[in-house]
Swiss-Prot record:
Species assigned in the record: Danio rerio (Zebrafish)
One Pfam family, short name: C19orf12
Listed name of the protein: Protein C19orf12 homolog
Record's keyword annotation contains Mitochondrion: yes
Lineage: Eukaryota, Metazoa, Chordata, Craniata, Vertebrata
One term under GO cellular component: mitochondrial membrane
Localization: Mitochondrion; Mitochondrion membrane; Endoplasmic reticulum; Cytoplasm, Cytosol
Annotated transmembrane regions: 37-57
């Protein structure tokens, strides 16, 4: 991986760590299928009351399936494939424009020292995560 790609990935990790962002890859379909499937099965077995019980149990199962799948955004960034990193790199470099840097420390200082640039890079990162990875983004309180 070219050094500049690695620098940009580390910058993205630093920005997301500072803002304490977590992501979850969407798996709502699995939760909905669990709720619907158990509601259907409950209806077959217990009639109208079975639908209610099956739906409630399925909803809890769906919630349990989804829980614990949030990861810190820096971890998600470091787990990107080389192709995904290259696409994210292109998005970020388009914002950085003609800025030149020698190492990740200098790049991080340049971006963190410019609130507007920091906001634009963060927005591009979150947009990439949402669009390309279909992930939910949450800020830790």
């Amino acid at each position: 991986m070219p050094p500049h790609v690695d620098d940009v990935m580390k910058l993205c990790c630093e920005l997301s760590a500072n803002q304490q962002v977590k992501t979850a890859v969407k798996q709502s379909g699995k939760g909905a299928a669990a709720a619907g499937g158990l509601a259907f099965a409950g209806g077959l077995i217990g009639g109208p009351l079975g639908i209610a019980v099956g739906g409630a149990v399925g909803g809890l199962l769906g919630c349990w399936m989804k829980s614990g799948q949030f990861k810190p955004l820096p971890q998600v960034i470091m787990e990107l494939t080389p192709d995904q990193q290259a696409r994210l790199y292109e998005d970020i470099v388009a914002i950085l424009g003609s800025i030149t840097w020698t190492d990740v420390a200098q790049l991080t200082a340049l971006v963190m020292g410019n609130a507007s640039l920091q906001q634009q890079v963060t927005a591009a990162l979150l947009s990439y995560i949402h669009k390309e990875l279909q992930a939910e983004v949450h800020y830790i309180d």
